[in-house]
């Protein structure tokens, strides 16, 4: 059985005017079906700014990479920035 990799990304919208629900939907749609989004949390930062935290799973394979996930995040309109908070190999 092959292992999987877990990633957690914190994504910031480019401005407070960005609808985080629409941004969340756009990111999930761009990642799917190749990457599995297990959960998305909305984090209140302050002054109306909200961050999104994406919990993503992918097979441990050369066909999948955190670089590709980051390219996808960069390509979504409304994303102001992001950071990889967690990266771990999962095996069962």
Swiss-Prot record:
Main role? Answer: Promotes the exchange of GDP for GTP in EF-1-alpha/GDP, thus allowing the regeneration of EF-1-alpha/GTP that could then be used to form the ternary complex EF-1-alpha/GTP/AAtRNA.
Q: Where is the signal peptide?
A: none
**What GO MF terms are annotated?**
translation elongation factor activity
The answer to whether UniProt assigns keyword Glycosyltransferase to this entry is no
Q: Does the keyword tRNA processing apply?
A: no
Family classification = Belongs to the EF-1-beta/EF-1-delta family.
Which InterPro entries does the annotation name? eEF-1beta-like_sf, EF1B_bsu/dsu_GNE, Transl_elong_EF1B/ribsomal_bS6, Transl_elong_EF1B_B_arc
This protein's species is Pyrobaculum calidifontis (strain DSM 21063 / JCM 11548 / VA1)
The protein's name is Elongation factor 1-beta
Q: Which UniProt keywords apply?
A: Elongation factor, Protein biosynthesis
The record ties this protein, via NCBIfam families, to:
PRK00435.1
């Amino acid at each position: 059985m092959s292992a999987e990799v877990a990633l957690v990304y914190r994504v910031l919208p480019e401005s407070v005017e960005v609808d985080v629900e629409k941004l969340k939907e756009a990111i999930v749609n761009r990642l799917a079906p190749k990457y599995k989004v297990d959960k998305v949390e909305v984090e209140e930062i302050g002054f109306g700014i909200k961050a999104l935290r994406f919990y993503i799973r992918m097979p441990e394979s050369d066909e999948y990479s955190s670089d590709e996930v980051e390219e996808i995040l960069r390509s979504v309109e409304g994303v102001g920035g992001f950071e990889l908070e967690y990266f771990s190999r999962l095996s069962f």
